[in-house]
């Protein structure tokens, strides 16, 4: 074959490879109901088809096209050069501390929005005590409490469509039932009669073996990600604030130091459900995952008890610990701009739970997904947030000794009450939330290894997918009456 023939073959093969890659991108984008990406991908696909025809039938165009494709490949090659500066997440959640930790202040559970909304009730001693200490919260809390519980009037954005609201309500019944079984002592439940309760009855397992069993058991039960960490006492709440079962004597008590190890799990929220945000299918998916997490962690906790060890399940009806820093320490992900976990494989599209235990286990190492640098330039969650609760600034601020982008919990929680769902728009619009499929796997692979990609990819993502959020069509079995658009619920009205 002549040199010109070899040149023609190489040029054609390179362009064909690009065409196939773009074709896969278009296919995945259509499958994901993306409104903009298939159009952009289709235009690029057509452009390279034209290039292919020019390569075959116009010899004079081959050299300029070769230069063009060479430049394209060279730019792509730059993203494959492994170079990162090392994210703070590699030091675990402690990497986000602003200083040496001397100015760190533990989170008080009494201050979280859920506790202020449903566990500080007018006319109670807790009400008088809390607002004597925090009078700055009183006016907002009373206005928000008048709107209802955490979700206000559930499902109001979708005309309170009863089948969907009933799915949400029924999902939360399981955590309600399991909350009382969260704390487990050795020999608890049915294991008591078989193994007894004495210290000598602890099962003697090598930590490596125990770790393998625990991780496999958790995944068999339904966890999508599992990690283990030493439990850092800084990530425990300082005082009890959430009361679910009438034990009001516990309100305001100091939360004891946690057990030495934590098994942290994440469950994936189905992409198609999340992408309907802020409509009811997204909160149905949240409720389902909270039920799933309660189920998994309760079984794990009682497994530890049956093995002769103490354990505490951390789920929607019993939290001693903050889940996000725990998950970072356990190697499940990083802290994102929206204030919660960007998980491996699934991005923010997860719910996180844990089990404390004193069984010796082997901790995992924190990971670097490239999310922190990516979030600096991306800002999609902040720009799409209906209540403007996520900061747009590139730089982080220090809060309780932690350097991070600080979510405005009050405006966020107000929006929940307005639409009757937990919103999920920031979760849905995040580029890391895209399904764990071929194209997105490749992007994640590059982001983990390339500092340049972390800076440039947010702009490429905006070009391909657009910057603003639009809810996707819900699955047919979750169709709700039309007439209420998410746009009608944007803004922070009612806060003034």
Region locations from a protein language model:
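Non-catalytic, usually N-terminal nucleic-acid engagement modules in DNA/RNA processing proteins
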Residues: 2-272, 279-280
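Phenylalanine-focused residue identity feature
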Residues: 7, 25, 45-47, 57, ...
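Flanking helices and flexible, charged tails adjoining ferredoxin-like Fe-S electron-transfer domains
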Residues: 11, 15, 20-23, 35, ...
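Glutamate identity and glutamate-enriched acidic tracts
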Residues: 28, 32-34, 109, 142, ...
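Context-gated lysine
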Residues: 39, 106, 132, 138, ...
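Compositionally biased, intrinsically disordered low-complexity regions
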Residues: 54, 94-97, 154-157, 243, ...
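Catalytic cores of enzyme domains
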Residues: 224-447
């Amino acid at each position: 074959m002549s040199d010109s023939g070899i040149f023609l073959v190489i040029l054609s093969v390179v362009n064909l490879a690009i065409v196939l890659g773009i074709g896969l991108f278009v296919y995945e984008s259509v499958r994901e109901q993306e409104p903009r990406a298939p159009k952009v991908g289709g235009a690029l696909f057509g452009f390279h088809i034209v290039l292919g025809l020019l390569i075959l039938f116009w010899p004079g165009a081959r050299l300029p096209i070769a230069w063009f494709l060479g430049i394209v490949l060279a730019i792509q090659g730059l993203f494959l050069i492994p170079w990162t500066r090392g994210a703070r997440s590699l030091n675990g959640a402690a990497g986000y501390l602003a200083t040496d930790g001397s100015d760190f202040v533990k989170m008080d559970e009494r201050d979280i929005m859920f506790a202020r909304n449903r566990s500080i009730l007018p006319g109670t001693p807790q009400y008088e005590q809390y607002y004597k200490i925090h009078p700055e919260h009183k006016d907002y809390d009373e206005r928000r409490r008048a709107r209802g519980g955490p979700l206000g009037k559930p499902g109001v954005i979708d005309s309170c469509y009863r089948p969907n609201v009933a799915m949400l309500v029924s999902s939360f019944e399981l955590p309600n039932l399991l909350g009382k079984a969260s704390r487990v002592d050795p020999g608890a439940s049915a294991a008591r009669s078989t193994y007894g309760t004495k210290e000598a009855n602890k099962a003697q397992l090598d930590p490596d073996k125990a770790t393998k069993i625990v991780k496999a058991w958790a995944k068999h039960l339904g966890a999508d990600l599992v990690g283990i960490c030493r439990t850092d006492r800084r990530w425990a709440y300082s005082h009890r604030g959430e009361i679910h079962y009438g034990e009001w004597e516990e309100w305001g008590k100091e939360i004891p130091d946690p057990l030495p190890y934590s098994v942290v799990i994440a469950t994936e929220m189905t992409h198609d459900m999340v992408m309907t945000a802020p409509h009811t299918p997204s909160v149905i998916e949240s409720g389902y995952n909270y039920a799933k997490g309660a189920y998994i962690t309760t079984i794990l906790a009682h497994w530890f008890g049956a093995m002769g060890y103490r354990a505490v399940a951390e789920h929607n009806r019993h939290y001693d610990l903050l889940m996000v820093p725990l998950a970072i320490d356990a190697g499940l992900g990083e802290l994102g701009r929206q204030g919660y976990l960007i998980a491996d494989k699934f991005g923010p599209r997860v719910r996180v739970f844990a089990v404390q235990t004193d069984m010796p286990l082997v901790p995992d190492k924190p990971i670097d997904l490239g999310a922190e640098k990516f979030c600096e330039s991306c800002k999609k969650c902040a720009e799409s947030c209906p209540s403007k609760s996520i900061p747009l600034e590139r730089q982080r601020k220090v809060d309780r000794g932690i350097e991070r982008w600080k979510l405005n919990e009050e405006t966020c929680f107000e929006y929940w009450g307005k639409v009757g769902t937990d919103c999920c728009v920031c979760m849905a619009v995040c580029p890391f939330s895209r399904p764990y499929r071929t194209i997105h796997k490749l992007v994640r692979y590059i982001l983990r290894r390339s500092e340049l990609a972390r800076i440039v990819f947010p702009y490429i993502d905006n070009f391909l997918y657009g910057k603003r959020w639009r809810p996707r069509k819900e699955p047919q079995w979750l169709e709700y009456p039309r007439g209420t658009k998410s746009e009608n619920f944007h803004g922070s009205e009612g806060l003034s």
